[in-house]
Amino acid sequence: MMRRRAFLRGAAGLAYGLAGRRPAGAQPPSAIEDELVVQTPVSAFIVEAMLKEFAAYAKERWQVTLKTRAQRAGTPVSYERIIAWKGQPEADIFWGGEPALFQSLAEQKLLTRLETPAETWDAIPGSIGAPKAIPLKDPGRQWVGTALEVYGIAYNPRLLKRLGVPEPRDWDDVLHPKLKGSVAQCTPYRSSSSHATYEVILQSRGEAEGWEWLKRLAANTGAFVAASRDVPAVVAKGEYAVGFGVPSYFVFEEKLAGFDIKFLAPKRAFVTPEPFAILAGARRPRAAREFLGFLLSERGQRLFMERGLFPVMPRYKVHGPPGSTVELAVQLTGGIRSFFEPPVTNVYDDEVARARFREVNERFKRDIESSWSGGKGR
């Protein structure tokens, strides 16, 4: 499918991060390092496109041939890896996932203060959502959001029709008795999208009712796949009818590949700002800082929109020509053009999630995974 460039509405584009000619006689900008390593759970569909575009920009601005590398792993796995590095990281950046884990790393002094210009920093609100606020940046400047996306339900409409199950309208619909063995999900200890969605269920229903709900979900689950990216893949292929706790842009990627797959953003779904942090002890801090500047520039925000994510600044809304991939992303998410209008309904409490992160994972292993029978009553 051919992709067409998006058109942004809103204020003029941010100058920071965009290429331009230097005035005659001006000194060239300080060069960046020639390598950049990113630790991330974000899909290669997003990461590789961003790194490729940033490398081209580095060549334009600094005449640097930048070598980039993404070390991909789920957010919980990446988090534990960063702790194990003990301030001598094998990457420069941690990008993507639940803000709670970034805040925890900041408290352990494993992140470094961001030097983002005030114009850019102030354009990003401190939080989004009500009655509980989802933080979009750290007041101490240890991390900042880069783009918004929602975690929801992926489903295969043809397979649902064959099973005699109506298309889902909210979370409870994944518990339909005819879906036994037909749901795919990732474990919360491997995926932050799954973990955050577990927290949405627990915090909206209370622990006792929430865990009973999650046990019923497990009874319908036919597969706990290795990574959250695999959830929409098996749904798109028709191996499973429904995917739980799925980032919207994963579904968008499958849609662009031509699969008949749909996405639902249920009420009270979690919206992540795809946090970005520079690791303490990073060997390439200048390249890391400039990559962040690029992501938060108009050029970077446009790239996010072309790949099914949403701007982290209210000044931008997702708009594109009819039939463009940008408009397809709007259609996929039920007409959303900005997560700032109307306001997001959110029950996820970041502090609660951070305080019991390991507790939720351990209880899942003990109460659900240990007795799971593949959703088929075996």
Whereabouts are the PLM-identified features?
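N-terminal export signals
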Residues: A6-A26
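Short loop->beta-strand "edge-of-pocket" segments that line small-molecule binding or catalytic clefts
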Residues: V37, D172-S192, V200-L202
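Ligand-binding "clamshell"
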Residues: L105-L114, P139, E253-A265
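Ligand-binding pocket segment of bilobal, Venus flytrap-like solute-binding proteins
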Residues: E199-A265
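Early extracytoplasmic/lumenal segment of secretory-pathway proteins
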Residues: P28-S104, P232
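A structural signal for short loop-to-beta-strand junctions that line the ligand-binding cleft
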Residues: P89-F94, T112-I153, D172
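Conserved C-terminal helix/tail region of periplasmic/extracytoplasmic solute-binding proteins
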Residues: R337-R378
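Mature extracytoplasmic/periplasmic domains
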Residues: L279-T345
